[in-house]
């Protein structure tokens, strides 16, 4: 992720009034264990984000292992395994099997990073899948704004 974007995120998330939006930084051990459990390799931009902020809000809730209290306790592992099981009959099941769920939209649809680093949303009601961004960094650039 660009240094400029990381600085914007740090300035926003380190404000005292935003303390519930940022979690605890992920450890290398947590990341390695999750990658092994999910049989994936996390994209370097996602790793940079969660090693800096943990699970945090950046225009959307980004789940990791220790999330900001306003985000919830589910981890990236919990969400990925849950959606892989729930949506195993959908046409996009392979995307879920090969990727990992980093967020959920307001309708309960998983937002997934695939092994190429592209970000998709999987609509559980219609069975459709849509490309949201070409990378995690592009997703955050599109979604994040300071208030």
Label the predicted regions.
Residues 1-109:
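A surface-exposed partner-binding patch
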Residues 103-105, 116, 124, 135:
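Structured loops at beta-to-helix junctions and adjacent beta-edge loops in soluble globular domains
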Residues 109-115:
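Broad, structure-driven detector of short, well-ordered beta-strand segments within folded domains
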Residues 129-147:
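Compact, glycine/acidic-enriched structural inserts
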């Amino acid at each position: 992720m660009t240094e400029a974007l990381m600085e914007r995120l740090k300035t926003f998330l380190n404000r005292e009034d935003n303390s519930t939006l940022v979690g605890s930084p992920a450890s290398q051990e947590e990341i390695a264990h999750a990658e092994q459990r999910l049989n994936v390799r996390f994209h370097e931009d996602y790793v940079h984000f969660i090693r800096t902020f943990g699970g945090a809000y950046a225009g959307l809730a980004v789940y990791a292992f220790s999330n900001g209290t306003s985000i919830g306790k589910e981890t990236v592992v919990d969400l990925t395994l849950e959606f892989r099981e729930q949506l195993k009959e959908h046409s996009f099941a392979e995307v879920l099997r090969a990727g990992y769920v980093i967020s959920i939209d307001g309708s309960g649809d998983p937002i997934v990073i695939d092994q190429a680093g592209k970000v998709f949303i999987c609509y559980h009601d219609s069975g459709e899948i849509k490309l949201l961004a070409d990378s995690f960094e592009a997703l955050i650039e599109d979604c994040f704004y300071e208030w």
